[in-house]
Each structure stands twice: as C-alpha cells, then as structure tokens.
Amino acid sequence: MRCAMLVEEHAAFRQAVAYLLARDLEVALVEEASTVAEARAKALENPGVIDVVVSELSLPDGDATDFLVALREAEADVPVLVLTFRKDRPSHERALELGAERVMSKDAPVGEILAAIRGFGDLEDD
C-alpha cells in the first residue's frame, strides 16, 4: 500500500479524496494538512514516507506554490497533483514550474483525477 498527503483546507473534501484513494488505488492516507505551514512541517517530518501529494492551490496561509518551494528546497522527490477551481493560467504554470506533476480542476471527473494519480510512477507496485 502506498502513502499520500492531502493538503486542503476543507475537511470534507480531504475525507472524500482519502476515501477514493483508499478504495480505488489502495493508497493509505499518511498525513492531512489544511495550511501551507502544516503541510511543510508534516512533509519534512516524513521524508521518504509520502509517495504522492494531492494539494489544493489556494490555502488559507498561501498557496501550493509555497509548499512546492519547500519541497524543492528539501530535495523531496514526491509527485504533487494540484487541484483547484482557479482558472488563471499563470498560477497553474507557476505550480508546474515549481515541480507539480499536474494541475487539474476540482470539477474534473473523478476517474480523470484518479488516473492522473495512478500515472505517478511511485504508486506502481514494487
């Protein structure tokens, strides 16, 4: 079983994504965070444990790009899927430049979101 971190300010959305990851991809939830600061602290506490991060772009204390910078500085090699309702291309491009594997709309079909996560090499069986 693989491990995920979910970064999203809304607990109900985190719980729904965790359920889908466990049910469809056999991914265990390792950490949850609702802010950039919390995500940074938890990711750096667990180097090498987290196989994938699913993060909202807009967070109460910043956005996913701040978290991506922290991951880069820590040389963490973990794929990050950024989910957002924001449509502005510059913020999507910035997230990709800083290391996000993909940026997707939160209203994308669930199957597409799961397929994107499934495509991350670290989630394949050893």
Where are the model-predicted features located?
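Acidic catalytic/metal-coordinating carboxylates
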Residues: 35, 63-66
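Two-component/phosphorelay signaling modules centered on CheY-like receiver
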Residues: 11-31
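Conserved active-site segment of CheY-like receiver
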Residues: 9, 83-87, 107
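Active-site residues of response regulator receiver
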Residues: 56-57, 84
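C-terminal output helix
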Residues: 108-118
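Short amphipathic alpha-helix used as the core "switch/output" element in two-component signaling
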Residues: 65-77
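Acidic, metal-coordinating helix/loop segments flanking the phosphotransfer/catalytic sites
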Residues: 34-52
